[in-house]
Amino acid sequence: MTTTAAATAAHPDPAKAQIAGAYRAHEPEVLAIARAIHADPEIAFTEHRAQERCADLLERAGFTLERGIADLPTAFRATIGEGSLVASLCVEYDALPELGHGCGHNLIAGASLGAALALAEQDRKSTV
């Protein structure tokens, strides 16, 4: 991935700049997972490896994981922090039969993971 001047320029909003910086710290692993999910498509309700990749990353980052929620073995809930502010992110990782990730769910998974990791870091610093 190539970094542009716009991507490295200081953001005028300090809070957004902190979150962007927190994301950049996790960007290599987030992109690696998005690419791995793309290279290993699993259709709905069979995406065990994709779920494991995503859940394991969040668990390593300090999230508490509940796997197999809502009677779906490939679903999970990851939580971190406490208090009245709640952010919910949907991590989609299923592929289309015969098309793979033409739907872009691998990218949605990566975006959601990146957002979760960046926001969690800000939560630990009590800046969100």
Regions found by a protein language model. Give the residues of each.
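Acidic/His- and Gly-rich active-site-bordering loop/insert found
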Residues: 9-124
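N-terminal acidic, proline/glycine-rich, low-complexity intrinsically disordered segments
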Residues: 1-8
